[in-house]
Swiss-Prot record:
Gene: COQ4
Protein name (record): Ubiquinone biosynthesis protein COQ4, mitochondrial
Additional information: This protein may be expected to contain an N-terminal transit peptide but none has been predicted.
PANTHER family in alphabetical order: UBIQUINONE BIOSYNTHESIS PROTEIN, UBIQUINONE BIOSYNTHESIS PROTEIN COQ4 HOMOLOG, MITOCHONDRIAL
GO cellular component terms given for this protein: extrinsic component of mitochondrial inner membrane
Subcellular location: Mitochondrion inner membrane
Requisite cofactors: Zn(2+)
Amino acid sequence: MLRTAIRNNVQVSQKRTYIMSTIASTFLGSILFSKNNQLASKMENGELHMPKDPTLSYLNNNNSNNQAEPYFKRREPDYPGHVPLYNYEKFLMFLGSSIGSFFHPEENKYIVALGESTAIEPILKKLQKTMLSDEIGRQILKEKPRITSTSLNLDYLRSLPDNTIGKNYINWLDKEGVSPDTRVQVKYIDNEELSYIFQRYRECHDFYHAITGLPIIIEGEISVKVFEFMNIGIPMTGLGALFAPLRLKSSQRKRLREIYYPWAIKNGIYSKPLINVYWEKILEQDVDEFRKQMGIETPPDLRNMRKEYFARKKLEKQGKL
C-alpha cells in the first residue's frame, strides 16, 4: 500500500510539473509569437532598424506622385537675368577669372567675372549705406538710371560747350574709341538693389576716366582702379592695383610708383564719394568746377609722359643724349 501511495504521489507531482511547464511554455510562446508578429510587421513596413525619415514622410504626404525633391536645387532668381550661385561656384569663378585677368587683361569677360565674384555683400551694403545717407544717392537708388548711348544722347553731348562735363566725357569716349553700351549687365550678384549698385559703378567707370583724363592703356586703367578702390572700395579694383603691375616693364612700374599711385591714393581718399554723383543731371556743369567741388586734382597727362619717355629713349640709342 505504501509503495502504491508513493507511486501515485510521484505521478501526480510529475503531472503537475508537466502542466506547469506546459502553461509556462505556452505563456512565453504566446509572448514570443506576439513579438515575432510585431517584428515581422515592422520588417514588412521597413521600420526595423530603419526608423522612418521625417523628411521622407513629409515628402510622401505632400507629393502626390511620391517623388522626392532633388537634393541640389538652384534657388529662384532675385531679379530678371539673375543667376544664383552656390558659394563654391562663386569661389571657382573667382579663381578662374583671377587667372584669366592676370594673363589676358584685354579679355573683358575675365574682368567682368572677377568684379562680380569679388563684390561681396558687406562691401555692397557699405556702398548702399553711403548712398542712403546722401540725398542724391537716395535719388539714384530710387530712380535707378542707366548709362547708355541712348539715355545720354551722345549727339547732344557733342553740342555742349567745351569745358562741360558732358563734352569732356564724349571727347574722351571718341578719343579712346569706346562706348557706354559695352558695359555688361550684372547677373551673379544676389539682391536686386545690391546688383544695381554694382551696375551703377560699372557704368560710371568711364566718367572717372574722363574727369581724370586717364586713357584706357594699362597704366591708365591701373591708376583709375587705385583711385576707385580708395574712394569706392570695390575689391576687384584693389586686386588690379596689386597684381596688374607685375606684368609691366620697370619704366611703367616706376611711373606708377612715383606719380600715379600717390595721386590715386590721395585723391581717392580725400574726394567725396563718387558713387553719389548723378552724372546724367550735371552734364552741363563746368568740369573744373566739378573737380573742385569733389576735391579731385587732375594727374599729369599719361600719354604725353609716355611720348616723352620713348622720345628720350630713342635719342639715347642714337647717342644724342
